[in-house]
Amino acid sequence: MMRIALFLLTNLAVMLVFGLVLSLTGIQSSSVQGLMIMAGLFGFGGSFVSLLMSKWMALRSVGGEVIEQPRNETENWLLETVRRQSQQAGIAMPQVAIYHAPDINAFATGARRNASLVAVSTGLLQSMSRDEAEAVIAHEISHVANGDMVTMTLIQGIVNTFVIFISRLIAQAAAGFLGNRDGEGEGNGNPMIYFGVSMVLELVFGILASIITMWFSRHREFYADAGSAKLVGREKMIAALQRLKTSYEPQEAGNMMAFCINGKSKSFSELFMSHPPLDKRIEALRSGQYLK
């Protein structure tokens, strides 16, 4: 329910800003400039709101609990490991959280490198050795140090903008042509055709655009693996990835998969996977391709 409310509020805010910009500039909403402004606001608006609220939304979606004071030896080890690795990586100490899940997983999120969150599953803490767990944590610390959350938000915003702009531009042309041919719309096109065509095109272009964002996501995973290898050693990271082969299928929400150590393996095609296959990640570490 909260996500629906945030979605509606975000879209309402975008529409208000859109109307204000058009009012101040005198640009027509149906013009190319108007479409570009609308596409940019909608394309980046949702992405940046999600980024700014990412820590809160992530904790809420998995039921994670931030460790304020360690209650046992495991929590103390986890905090000290994150503190040591964040110092090595040159970033501020992230918040650390644990969430209950049987799968071996962890994720990092946050709007800034120095205001981030690292969360690990109970399955990881129970199933991995300390060396393997250190490697997974270092992978997430590397995501933060590399600024991957902001990078992926920018990429998603750009892709969203192009999808919306191109879809609406083609829909506007189609509505004008078909509406005027039928003698409807009084020169402005048929609104039913416009919305129908734009919805279909946004769906189709959105699927194609996801190939681009997923490629970037897989690319960042290789660099996060390499970052972990630099922090704790290549063999520890390889051992952690080999351990992931025995894990349950991840249960985290789809919007969190991009920054989990373990992505979903069941996909129509590798093109739509947020993570490379584990064997490819292991091979990349062994070859040192991303360690240069």
Curated annotation (Swiss-Prot):
The chain crosses the membrane at residues 4-24, 34-54, 158-178, 192-212. Gene3D superfamilies: Metalloproteases ('zincins'), catalytic domain. Pfam families: Peptidase_M48. It is found in: Cell inner membrane. InterPro entries: HtpX_protease, Pept_M48_protease_HtpX, Peptidase_M48. Its cofactor is Zn(2+). This is Protease HtpX. It comes from Serratia proteamaculans (strain 568).
